From Swiss-Prot:
Subunit comment: Interacts with sulfhydryl oxidase OPG072; this interaction involves formation of a transient disulfide-bonded intermediate, allowing disulfide bond transfer. Interacts with OPG088; this interaction involves formation of a transient disulfide-bonded intermediate, allowing disulfide bond transfer.
The entry's keywords: Disulfide bond, Late protein, Redox-active center
Pfam families for this protein: Pox_A3L
Organism of this sequence: Vaccinia virus (strain Copenhagen)
Entry keyword annotation includes Ligase: no
Family: Belongs to the orthopoxvirus OPG128 family.
Protein name per its UniProtKB record: Protein OPG128
Induction notes from the record: Expressed in the late phase of the viral replicative cycle.
Species lineage: Viruses, Varidnaviria, Bamfordvirae, Nucleocytoviricota, Pokkesviricetes
Cystine bridges: C17-C21
Length: 76
């Protein structure tokens, strides 16, 4: 059992978002798509978490700029 299987994140309801934070995430994902794709397909739980996060972040009220470093850490 890996440590991240016990890891649980509970996010507060969405609050707000700027257009710049969406651009930051898009840039991270576009920089090295093949590497990120390989990482995520090899780790289905991370893929599901990212899919859920991206679905939530489409709500423009969600401030996720503070999560940029965490997204970068998880994807590398």
């Amino acid at each position: 059992m890996s440590w991240y299987e016990k890891y649980n994140i509970v996010l507060n309801p969405p609050k707000r978002c700027s257009s710049a934070c969406a651009d930051n995430l898009t840039t991270i994902l576009a920089e090295d798509g093949n590497h990120i794709r390989a990482i995520l397909y090899s780790q289905p739980k991370k893929l599901k978490i990212l899919q859920d996060f991206l679905a939530t972040s489409r709500n423009k009220m969600f401030l996720y700029k503070i999560l940029d470093d965490e997204i970068r850490r998880v994807l590398t």
